[in-house]
Each structure stands twice: as structure tokens, then as C-alpha cells.
């Protein structure tokens, strides 16, 4: 059994989602958004760090999955996103969590089936996959999708690792 916290970083809104993976079964544990309503960037970063740290303390995940930075049209936005992402990663690393990174297109491809999916499609599939009664907020749904993606790739890695250490694996045809 593994608990994963997914993080969708943003300088104004950082989404988070927590799921438990038991084999192929996923269970929703919680999700939400850390909203920073102040204007100065250092205070926003402090609030993101504190919020992510609190979530980690509350849910005690085994690992963190976070969205990779993508190239934004506005360089200032990309820098702010990178800073928000950095403090979220530090919050995880400071609590000894391994951190895994996934590209947004890969997350959409894994959860929806197309890397060009829009937010509504991601929300719908997250709701369906986790059997939720309502769609989560967009940023929380993105964070849950990141956690789901990690589960998908973690299962693949576990199968690959088992095949490598299984003495019978070489005999299977």
C-alpha cells in the first residue's frame, strides 16, 4: 500500500491530491487548493511551502509526484511557476519524501488518453477513475491526475523490477 501526494504547482493556486494505491486499486483520500492571495512573491512562496508541509504532515504520504515545468509564453510566469514548484519540492524533501516529476502532456495522455486534453476532460476522468460523486476543482483534479500517473508508472516499474529479480522470468516465453 502506497500513499501518493500529487502537486500541481502555481504561484497563485497550488493544487494537491492524495490517493492510496493498493495494487491496481486507487482510493481517494483528499484534495484541494492552496490559494495565495497576497501580492509579494516571497510571502506566496512561504504560504505554498507551509501548505504543502501541512498536507504532508496530515496525510503522511510515501512519495510526492509533481508536474514538470513547461515553457510558458511569458518568461516571468515560467520563473514564478518554477519558484512555486521549487518550494513544494523542498517541502517534500524536508520530510524525506522521494519526489517524482511528470510532464503535463504525459499526465493528460495517461489519465485521458490524449496529451492535448483540456481541464474539463481531466476533471471528468479523475472523477471517474477515483469514483468521486463530483468533479474536483480544476487544480486539485490536475494534482490527482499527477498522482494517478505516478501510480500507473509505479505499477509498471514494479512489474519490471519483479521480472528482473524473478529467477523464473528468464525461463518464461
UniProtKB/Swiss-Prot annotation:
Q: What is its EC number?
A: 3.1.21.10
- So what family is this one in? Belongs to the RuvC family.
Which positions does UniProt annotate for Mg(2+) 1 binding? 8, 139
Catalyzed chemical reaction(s):
Endonucleolytic cleavage at a junction such as a reciprocal single-stranded crossover between two homologous DNA duplexes (Holliday junction)
Keyword Membrane, does the record have it?
no
What Gene Ontology terms describe what this protein does at the molecular function level? crossover junction DNA endonuclease activity; DNA binding; magnesium ion binding
Matches recorded under NCBIfam families: PRK00039.2-1, ruvC
Task: List the GO biological process terms.
Answer: DNA recombination; DNA repair
Return the broad EC class: hydrolase
**Main localization (coarse):** cytoplasm
UniProt cofactor note: Binds 2 Mg(2+) ion per subunit.
Q: HAMAP family from the xrefs?
A: RuvC
**Signal peptide coordinates:** none
Q: What is the lineage of its organism?
A: Bacteria, Pseudomonadati, Pseudomonadota, Gammaproteobacteria, Enterobacterales
Where does the record place the catalytic residues? Answer: 8, 67, 139
Q: What does this protein do?
A: The RuvA-RuvB-RuvC complex processes Holliday junction (HJ) DNA during genetic recombination and DNA repair. Endonuclease that resolves HJ intermediates. Cleaves cruciform DNA by making single-stranded nicks across the HJ at symmetrical positions within the homologous arms, yielding a 5'-phosphate and a 3'-hydroxyl group; requires a central core of homology in the junction. The consensus cleavage sequence is 5'-(A/T)TT(C/G)-3'. Cleavage occurs on the 3'-side of the TT dinucleotide at the point of strand exchange.
Pfam families per the UniProt record, alphabetical: RuvC
**Matching InterPro entries, A to Z?**
RNaseH-like_sf (IPR012337), RNaseH_sf (IPR036397), X-over_junc_endoDNase_Mg_BS (IPR020563), X-over_junc_endoDNase_RuvC (IPR002176)
Keyword DNA damage among record annotations: yes
Gene that this sequence comes from: ruvC
| Complexes and interactors | Homodimer which binds Holliday junction (HJ) DNA. The HJ becomes 2-fold symmetrical on binding to RuvC with unstacked arms; it has a different conformation from HJ DNA in complex with RuvA. In the full resolvosome a probable DNA-RuvA(4)-RuvB(12)-RuvC(2) complex forms which resolves the HJ.
Location of the protein in the cell: Cytoplasm
Key words, A-Z: Cytoplasm, DNA damage, DNA recombination, DNA repair, DNA-binding, Endonuclease, Hydrolase, Magnesium, Metal-binding, Nuclease
The molecule here is called Crossover junction endodeoxyribonuclease RuvC
